[in-house]
Amino acid sequence: MINLDIFRLQSFYSLSNFESHDALKEKLLHQISLADNVPMNWKDKYYDDNIHRCDWDLGEDFKRTFVKEFLPPLNDHLDEIGKAFSLSEVVLRQIWYQQYKIGDLHGWHNHAGCQFTGIYYLDQPKDAPKTQIITPLSDEVITIDFKEGDILIIPSYIIHTSQKNTSDKIKTIISFNFDWKNIFSDSLLKFNQHLN
């Protein structure tokens, strides 16, 4: 048996307005309407997930039309957010869309193989549910107070859910997994002061 000591670290999530939202929303929704679709249906003793339209299986294909449209402003946006955390050089791992019709849900889950997960709320009906996250170690459930056009960034180990869609309108998100590869040099010089 192992001895395990657990110590608290502060974690975070960030919520920011995507400045290109108004210019891109209708174009991205149209491109997604024409995109490949692999509905997600997971049903076992743990999950009863159903996502009406999705291309998660194609997440590593960056040549899809909506991805090529979305990536340049997304990378600029993530570069700006990274500055707040002293991190630079975004490495995108996967990107995909999900569309939820009434009754669809994506149960509690996390993301592997990346440092961070992002959710861009492309089309969020007013009566559609908000993303919820579990606070590590306390198991407190937090409902994220976002609005359409926002981007949520969470560490990829954070357990989160998109609860059952109660709206009769389609909810559309673009999700992405990524890393920040480096530390800004100015920050690194500051951090080096703590080295012996």
What does each of the following model-derived ranges do?
Residues 1-87:
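Non-heme Fe(II)/2-oxoglutarate
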Residues 195-196:
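Short, cationic low-complexity segments
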Residues 89-158, 163, 170-172, 180-192:
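Catalytic core of non-heme Fe(II) oxygenases with the double-stranded beta-helix
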Residues 14-20, 25, 49, 53-54, ...:
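Residue-level detector of solvent-exposed, low-hydrophobicity positions
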